């Protein structure tokens, strides 16, 4: 790989800004926080150079265009699918062509589920085709389907109160949308709770903050000792319509057909690339997003955007001829949508070196206009991150909020490694999440430029500071 020896922006020699004196004695920092603040402030011109390149310079729109090429070419990338395998191989080649270092694939085993053909039709009180999306890991119905009367409930509590009515029926959940973290339990646990009271299947109102007759899929979980029943999500509109019908005392009958099957686990890979550290190469700042998606839409928002701004962060740093003291590592996870399967296998493989991880970063809540970071770590680490984020004042992206957790980095965070997630405008995120609407049309190249600049500045500065982030 070639690195630029000199890079000038506004007459400033970037590499001179990266030099730092040794501040360790017997492994203990002797610096005051004011000295740390001064060190971070010295990266101001580096941050401006990254911002200029990403937002206004030759690299603007690059992450968007790279992403569009992949998702238009490959499409959705379900765990275990040929599409995911193809995307991984394409990204492996892309990272090599980008002249990043130590590009490699780390193998693992991941779930392989396919939805097959599926349909739902209301037979009573009138004929009405119901849009559905089967949920990940659901079983299928018999070939002839399941035809049964419907019981509509709005909560698990109501289901328990009406348990005697549920046997032999299809339970329809019309739970209100509060927020994703509180409402998603109906998607993940709806089938189990319905099966406990003798239901034949469950249909769940999509976990969406807005709907234009769009079902949203996602993972669901069975429980040992509880019968497994078919389960799918339906649109907000159909859930509300059936709730209104039921409140009038009208009998509702649905025929449900699902061809879903689970196959043996299959081979897959986490995709890795680096810029090797100049002084502490064994120490790591990790940036990441997941390459897999659900099998609807294009997986552009979830999580193509996060994966591609993570790649872009390394590209920007490489293009400026910068080499941080620590290794900056990109990981594109496999099988996140099945519960962080690829990330867990990565953690199991690398946790022996956990003391060398300074910061783990994940972007998996969209790449809309960012306002800052969500961060989990010690108070001292948070104070450092607040100073780092002040470098992004030119973009007005300076917030540091709590809860930096993400599915793929939680393993590290729970073990004490500081973690960060991109904080961006989520207003429209759950309009499109896990639906046919997750396409490149959702993405905004200018917003991706800003997100990539944030990702690059934060990862570079933390990787280049003389000290790792302090832990509790």
Swiss-Prot record:
Residues 1-20 form the signal peptide. GO terms for molecular function: carboxypeptidase activity; metal ion binding; metallodipeptidase activity; protein homodimerization activity. It is found in: Endoplasmic reticulum; Golgi apparatus; Lysosome; Secreted. It is an enzyme of class 3 (hydrolase). The active site is at residue 336. Coiled coil: none annotated. Its EC number is 3.4.17.-. Glycans are attached at residues 61, 179, 353, 356, 396. One of its GO terms (cellular component) is extracellular space. Residues 21-44 form a propeptide. InterPro entries: CPQ, Peptidase_M28. Its main location: endoplasmic reticulum. Keywords: Carboxypeptidase, Endoplasmic reticulum, Glycoprotein, Golgi apparatus, Hydrolase, Lysosome, Metal-binding, Metalloprotease, Protease, Secreted, Signal, Zinc, Zymogen. GO terms for biological process: peptide catabolic process; proteolysis; thyroid hormone generation; tissue regeneration. N-glycosylated. The secreted form is modified by hybrid or complex type oligosaccharide chains. Homodimer. The monomeric form is inactive while the homodimer is active. Belongs to the peptidase M28 family. This is Carboxypeptidase Q.
